[in-house]
UniProtKB/Swiss-Prot annotation:
This is Sec-independent protein translocase protein TatB. Residues 93-103 have a biased composition (Basic and acidic residues). The lineage of its organism: Bacteria, Pseudomonadati, Pseudomonadota, Betaproteobacteria, Burkholderiales. The Tat system comprises two distinct complexes: a TatABC complex, containing multiple copies of TatA, TatB and TatC subunits, and a separate TatA complex, containing only TatA subunits. Substrates initially bind to the TatABC complex, which probably triggers association of the separate TatA complex to form the active translocon. Residues 109-122, 133-151 have a biased composition (Low complexity). One of its GO terms (cellular component) is TAT protein transport complex.
Amino acid sequence: MFDVSFTELMVIGVIALVVIGPERLPKVARTIGHLLGRAQRYVNDVKSDIRREIELDELRKFKDEMDETARSMQTSLRETEDTLRDSTQALRAELDDTARDASKAVNGADAPAEPAPAVASDTDTDTDTRSIAPPAAATPADKTPPTGSAT
């Protein structure tokens, strides 16, 4: 920690022996050892607290990134939902219009047709008139909508 060599420690020990004396030196050395131990524990506690705070800070940053990603995904999903809803409403309106037109066409076909006036030809001067045949009734095969395939 302090980069002190063995010879420097020996010099400090000899000076302490001369200054403090041989009777009090063991007690002072024990007290200094306890103080150094407490200082090391305190430094280690501070280091571990700093590590925990750094890890918590990293976790908070990660959580914030995940929250931001979740918000962007929700926004994207809402936009997609709105787009799909608009498309569905447009298709539903178009389908309703088509159904209404088809209903009108069916109701118009069910109405009794007025007889067409007889057309006289130059070759036929008789009272014989040609009748106009009504359109043939639709068969079940004709009622199926076209699928776009030639099968």
